[in-house]
């Protein structure tokens, strides 16, 4: 083991395994975190850059998940050769917290598939959808284990590197003149006027992820890092502008500023009120769409839903707003759309929608009334309250901000199972909780040392 330690970790070695043998697990867990070799950081940034730039290299779509498995392997190997388990408890707690909905989705889906005698290829597709997000969760837990709060920095660097590559690719294909002209028109029109060069920058999933990074920079970072990260995230968020993401970002920022200025007790009350209100709104939103009232409202107000109204109407016969509605399992909506599109039935014959562009209703259809109720409650109340009790108000508020932003995008898009937004969504609170813990431990060490230093000074003076 020491030989492996020297090969993989250089001077950092595998001394913790000796401590484990001599002092036991509890004493070992009290030791300082082992320093990480610099090349691990660069390896992670490189892997994330390729993962976020997946399509630009002409690589298979699943390459990003292969690289995320690589991050997991890198963390496991480092732990194996160093015996450093210090961050595992916190990382494990978050893994369970974020993993619980995936377990619920898999269990309910398997039950529904069995009752409906579904085909094996349909069931495997639903399971793979859940598995991909378990991989993303494992990768982000591994990144936080390796780098602590700095994992946010390194992930952002990878995202920026990927988007820079996308920008350079657009310039290469369309020319610098077309790019500059399109960028000026894009900025003047507020994201409405685009040419081919700017259209190439509209990377939906990555743009939503940059929105989360910008949200974190504005609400949680302080000092020079806040300005730098807000500038980087804001630039790429603007270039890939998604209007619903912008609405979500502005709404969360204003609400965050309001909550942040309140006292802790008031903050706890506000979290509870927001969660109750959000649960009611989500159920009300599903009812409006299923009953057809939503379409009546948007038609009366002459709002352009870009075809969503017709899509919602086509699904009205598929589900009911009732406690007796049990759902169809994960992946049903996209499969239904694919079958109807191939058959050219109704609105599906006019356009390939790809998804329902409303993941709140999609989750209701796939999980059923009670599965949806659990998902909504857990998202808005269960995990946020748990975070508050275990890791403090700041981590809980960050998770609340992310949830508000996420659900605003769910209302008009297919982001629940987007890879990049979920990767960043899971990363931020884990890294922040670890950062708060380690900062508190460091502060405690200094406080314990100060009395000893004062005593030594008194002895010298006497």
Regions found by a protein language model. Name each.
Residues 42, 399-462:
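Transmembrane alpha-helices of multi-pass inner-membrane enzymes
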Residues 70-71, 93-107, 117-145, 154-156:
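Aromatic-anchored transmembrane helix interface
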Residues 19-22, 268, 366-407, 436-438:
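Hydrophobic transmembrane alpha-helices and their immediate junctions
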Residues 113-119, 150, 154, 162-204, ...:
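Membrane-interfacial helix-loop-helix modules of multi-pass inner-membrane proteins that assemble, modify
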Residues 168-172, 257-301:
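A membrane-periplasm/extracellular boundary helix in multi-pass inner-membrane enzymes
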Residues 152-178, 199-259:
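Alpha-helical transmembrane segments of multi-pass inner-membrane proteins
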Residues 299-367:
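Long extracytoplasmic/lumenal interhelical loops at the membrane interface
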Residues 3-9, 17-84, 104-113, 170, ...:
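N-terminal signal-anchor transmembrane segment
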């Amino acid at each position: 083991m020491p030989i492996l330690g020297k090969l993989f970790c250089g001077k950092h070695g595998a001394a913790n395994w000796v401590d484990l043998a001599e002092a036991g697990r509890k004493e070992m867990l009290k030791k300082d975190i082992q320093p990480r070799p610099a090349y691990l950081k660069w390896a992670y940034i490189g892997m994330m850059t390729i993962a976020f730039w997946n399509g630009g290299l002409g690589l298979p779509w699943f390459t990003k998940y292969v690289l995320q498995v690589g991050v997991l392997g890198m963390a496991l190997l480092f732990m194996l050769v160093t015996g450093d388990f210090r961050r595992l408890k916190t990382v494990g707690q978050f893994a369970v917290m974020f993993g619980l909905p995936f377990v619920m989705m898999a269990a309910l889906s398997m039950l529904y598939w069995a009752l409906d005698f579904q085909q094996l290829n349909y069931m495997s597709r639903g399971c793979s959808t859940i598995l991909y997000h378990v991989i993303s969760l494992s990768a982000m837990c591994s990144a936080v284990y390796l780098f602590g709060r700095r994992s946010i920095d390194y992930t952002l660097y990878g995202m920026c590197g990927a988007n820079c590559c996308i920008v350079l690719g657009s310039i290469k294909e369309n020319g610098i003149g077309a790019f500059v002209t399109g960028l000026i028109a894009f900025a003047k029109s507020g994201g409405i006027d685009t040419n081919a060069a700017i259209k190439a920058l509209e990377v939906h999933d990555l743009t939503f992820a940059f929105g989360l990074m910008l949200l974190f920079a504005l609400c949680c970072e302080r000092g020079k890092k806040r300005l730098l990260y807000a500038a980087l995230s804001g630039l790429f968020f603007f270039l890939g502008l998604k209007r619903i993401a912008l609405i979500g970002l502005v709404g969360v920022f204003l609400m965050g500023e309001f909550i942040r200025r309140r006292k802790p007790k008031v903050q706890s009350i506000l979290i509870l009120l927001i969660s109750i209100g959000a649960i009611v709104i989500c159920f009300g939103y599903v009812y409006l769409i299923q009953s057809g009232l939503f379409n009546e409202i948007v038609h009366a107000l002459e709002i352009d839903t870009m075809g969503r109204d017709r899509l919602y109407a086509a699904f009205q016969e598929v589900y009911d707003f009732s406690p007796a509605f049990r759902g169809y399992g994960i992946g049903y909506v996209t499969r239904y759309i694919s079958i109807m599109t191939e058959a050219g039935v109704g609105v599906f014959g006019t356009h390939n929608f790809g998804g329902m562009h409303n993941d709140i209703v999609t989750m209701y259809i796939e999980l059923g009334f009670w599965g949806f109720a659990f998902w909504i409650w857990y998202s808005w109340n269960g995990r946020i309250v748990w975070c508050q009790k275990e890791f403090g108000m700041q981590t809980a508020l960050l998770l609340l901000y992310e949830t508000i932003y996420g659900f605003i995008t769910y209302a008009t898009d297919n982001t629940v199972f987007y890879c990049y937004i979920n990767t960043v969504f899971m990363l931020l609170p884990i890294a922040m909780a670890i950062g708060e813990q380690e900062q508190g431990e460091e502060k405690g060490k200094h406080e314990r040392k100060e009395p000893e230093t004062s005593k030594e000074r008194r002895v010298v003076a006497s």
